[in-house]
Amino acid sequence: MAERARIVIIGGGIAGVSALYHLAKMGCTDVLLLERDELSSGSTWHAAGNVPTYSGSWSIMKVQKYSAELYRELAKDKENPINYHVTGSVRLAHSNERMAEFKHVTSMARANGMEYDVLTPKELKDRYPLLETHDLVGALWDPLDGDIDPSQITAAMAAAARKLGARVRRNERVTALKQHANHEWTVTTDKAEIECEIVLNAAGYRAGEVMALIGRHLPIMTMSHQYLITEEIPELEARGEHKLPLLRDPDTSYYLRQERSAFILGPYEWQSTAMWLDGIPDQFANMLWPADIERLEKQILDAGERVPVLGDVGIAKVVNGPIPYAPDGNPYLGPERGMRNFWHCNTFSFGIAQGGGAGKAIAEWILNGRPEFDLWSIDRRRYKEYATTQYTVDKALEVYQNEYAMGFPFEERPAGRPSYMSPLYDLLKSKGAQYGARGGWERPTYYDPKGEVTDHTLSFFRKQGWRKVVAEECHAARNGVAVLDLPGFTKIKVSGPGATAYLDNLLCTKLPKVGRLSLVYALLPDGKVLSEFTVARIADDEYYLVGAASSEWHDLDVLEMALPTDGSVTLRNVTKDYGSIIVVGPKSREVLAKVTTTRSEEHTSELQSHSDLVCRLLLEKK
């Protein structure tokens, strides 16, 4: 007879154990964690253990802040000792652009209750006396940064979860997953069969293998990431217990951390390598790859100039281990698209910093229906079918190489593109369209038909080279007419005898009359916005919903999970069946009059109305 648990967690790294701990802490103790090897034996055990709160993402900053707070609290438990050092950190700025970024993130941190500060070179030297500062503009100070022993914090959370009644089984491999008509699961392992309501995939770099058990693809790849530990340095030994702050030099792409009387140097180099493209070895627990020190030469030399005591010190050890990456470097949290009771908490490139907060968030999401704060930037459903294995590898390598790069507004990185294109793509490109990507779709960001934009330098100071041509486009849209090709908007048809009642119950805004448009919202019980749609009412029981390109899978879940079971409502995803051409400006009516078989004056000029216009679109042929 099969055993039973409400929730089965697959994976015993810091993310899975944190989820176990937080589920139990919230009162759900009927949880079983299955680990194929030993706890923390995948990517967790060899992690450097840095615990930054810094992030350019509001939601990730919140996740990391909670992790730091949780670890400080757990470190007080004398039964499960944890080596946790809160040293603070300095991030170096070589330019005014970098200082502008630091000031922006400092304001975010202060809004989140953290006392970041921006330092002058002199103030920086006071905090880090071994540092060469003559060519620096300044630095950012994060007082909460530090480092922790990854295996110890994982073991401490596992022990706390067990005390609360949760279960952990090691050396037990999941071999099959089967979902039943009632949306519950049978989890088959090499030792048992377990019936459960919910499966949580927390399998780290093996999360894609778990997805294969349910016949689905996860955009994940494995990166080779290295850090080195130096031999002992007398100047550090002389400092005694006065440990230096963690140092990050983003403009040369490395971190430097005091480890007893030595340094740990962790670069994010341009020559990183995608691993295991043909599959993950069956056995790799607590294992590493051979060192590839040549890849790190530039960062080693730069660090030696920045902190001269590194000098000619020798290298005691190199750690070269596997780290999972999504195409944007962010983890996957939340439900699997179109599938009840299957959840994600995996693919952490910065698992120690994010593991504590991610465990809290996924526990809240599973038990309460939503986490405390918005997590769209790490929602599993942000990536759709276009995120193939090759796309994932290309984008992840690009992200790794730019790990410390400045996050400029309007930056468009080229790797993995194009994926989805409008039928007008080639025509508009020949007319000077410069493209960006939204939800996998190529969209023109501006036009440069005369080749006027020669300076493509990115900036925080509104000095972008495209400002002049964009201003001309805005002037045309305000005073004449502009035609925009905006493909990729999520487009869903809702029809059937129950369609009106279904949408009226799901959406907070009054539904439009036939022939009219409304901007509508699906809300959470606490009033927060879940989805936004523009809805056109085609007939009494037929509606056309338009949503954001990037949220297609999310919005489909919102609609599908609320469908009545009596078959009275039909949903049809027509996102790829129709394009989106926007005609705007005071002279837009004149343009439409030339391409429609219906006189434009027959149509109302009110904003919230629509009509089916039969148009002829003449495309130039080369």
Name each model-derived stretch.
Residues 2-15, 32:
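Beta1/beta-strand and adjacent pyrophosphate-binding region of the FAD-binding site
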Residues 373-374, 378-601, 605, 611:
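Glycine/proline-enriched, intrinsically flexible loops and inter-domain linkers
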Residues 251, 260, 282, 286-420:
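C-terminal catalytic lobe of FAD-dependent flavoproteins
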Residues 70-73, 85, 94-170, 175-188, ...:
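Flavin (FAD/FMN) cofactor-binding and adjacent substrate-gating region
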Residues 606-622:
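Positively charged, low-complexity/disordered segments
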Residues 49-127, 251-256, 260-264, 290, ...:
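Dinucleotide-binding Rossmann-like beta1-alpha1 core, especially the glycine-rich loop
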Residues 18, 177-290, 298-306, 391-412, ...:
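Flavin-dependent oxidoreductases
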Residues 24-44:
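Glycine-rich FAD pyrophosphate-binding loop
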